Swiss-Prot record:
It is an enzyme of class 2 (transferase). InterPro entries: Acetyl_CoA_COase_a_su, ClpP/crotonase-like_dom_sf, COA_CT_C. GO terms for cellular component: acetyl-CoA carboxylase complex. This is Acetyl-coenzyme A carboxylase carboxyl transferase subunit alpha. GO terms for biological process: fatty acid biosynthetic process; malonyl-CoA biosynthetic process. Component of the acetyl coenzyme A carboxylase (ACC) complex. First, biotin carboxylase catalyzes the carboxylation of biotin on its carrier protein (BCCP) and then the CO(2) group is transferred by the carboxyltransferase to acetyl-CoA to form malonyl-CoA. GO terms for molecular function: acetyl-CoA carboxylase activity; ATP binding; carboxyl- or carbamoyltransferase activity.
Length: 319
């Protein structure tokens, strides 16, 4: 996956362009001396140092941009690295199969699990097929169908959240978007199996929460979780999307802020420069956290899980 640099990464992009140019010349001209190779090494060291410096002080808006990065790994990317024997299950058994929600049975270290998550799509045709990761009611009903199946067979549920929000189209509203989300919130609160939810990119509003009522809620370091997008908030409060950076800061959408407010349990570190820089390393960190969470939840009986989940939900809105 090639690196796409965001605006605030431009100084890094400039150095990487020089490295690419020198490397290209070096591969063509085999007579290049040691000084030439040393210059490439110096630039690589400088790029790493500059990346560390920039990423040590990211604003909430810059983190929002990283959460939306076009090369950021999506749920199905992680499935390849973390799970085996993935068997996708389709349809809500009522209306249609919403491709914005992907789910099915899989194994993590030979243990059966039900995995469910948003899928945005990468190329234009796939983005349209996946509706840019914005589920309609049938997507949430499919997710609930799979959760109830997992509950019936005592299989833990792992959800992966990455959506701008639930689809706000007329058809979705006519088919009961708000009802589907509300039903998921209610039903997830009473499932008798462990639920681990991880925000891997954007966690947008009710569209995220509809598969995010977990016993453990994690966030990748450069993911976001909010009731509305920074642009939406800025449009309402300041009547201008130009104020999105200010809105992002005010809403506290980043993992560190949400951990401080006790709305999430863990922050999963990302490779230097973001998850897209090294998907394998990111997947290994995510897998480690999932296994840790499952082992902790395994120690609880059914009633303890339900009580813990209920108490967690009731604390929302309190510092």
């Amino acid at each position: 996956m090639s690196i796409n640099f965001i605006d605030f990464e431009q100084p890094i992009a400039d150095i990487e362009a020089k490295i690419e140019s020198l490397t290209s010349i070096s591969s063509i001209d085999k007579t290049c001396d040691t000084n030439f190779n040393e210059e490439i090494k110096r630039l690589r060291d400088k790029s790493i140092e500059l990346t560390r410096k920039i990423f040590a002080h990211l604003s909430a808006w810059q983190i929002a941009q990283l959460a939306r990065h076009p090369c950021r790994p999506y749920m199905l990317d992680y499935v390849q690295y973390i799970f085996t024997d993935f068997d996708e299950l389709a349809g809500d058994r009522a209306y249609a199969d919403d491709k914005a929600i992907v789910g099915g049975l899989a194994r993590i270290n030979s243990r059966p699990v039900m995995i469910i998550g948003h899928q945005k799509g990468r190329e234009i045709k796939e983005k349209i097929r996946r509706n840019f990761g914005m589920p309609a009611p049938e997507g949430y009903r499919k997710a609930l169908r799979l959760m109830k199946m997992a509950d019936r067979f005592s299989i833990p549920i792992l959800t992966f959240i990455d959506t701008p929000g639930a689809y706000p189209g007329i058809g979705a509203e006519e088919r009961g978007q708000s009802e589907a989300i509300a039903t998921n919130l209610r039903e997830m609160a009473y499932l008798r199996v462990p639920i681990v939810s991880t925000i891997i990119g954007e966690g947008g509003s009710g569209g995220a929460l509809a598969i995010g009522v977990g016993d453990k809620v994690n966030m990748l370091k450069y993911s976001t979780y909010s009731v509305i997008s920074p642009e939406g908030c800025a449009s309402i409060l300041w009547k201008s999307v130009d104020k999105a950076p200010l809105a992002a800061e005010a809403m506290g959408i980043n993992a560190a802020r949400l951990k401080k407010l006790k709305l999430i349990d863990s922050i999963i570190p990302e490779p230097l420069g973001g998850a897209h820089r090294d998907v394998a390393i990111m997947a290994a960190s995510l897998k480690k956290q999932l296994l840790f969470d499952l082992s902790e939840l395994d120690r609880m009986n059914e009633q303890e899980l339900l009580d813990r989940r209920y108490n967690r939900i009731m604390k929302y809105g309190y510092c």
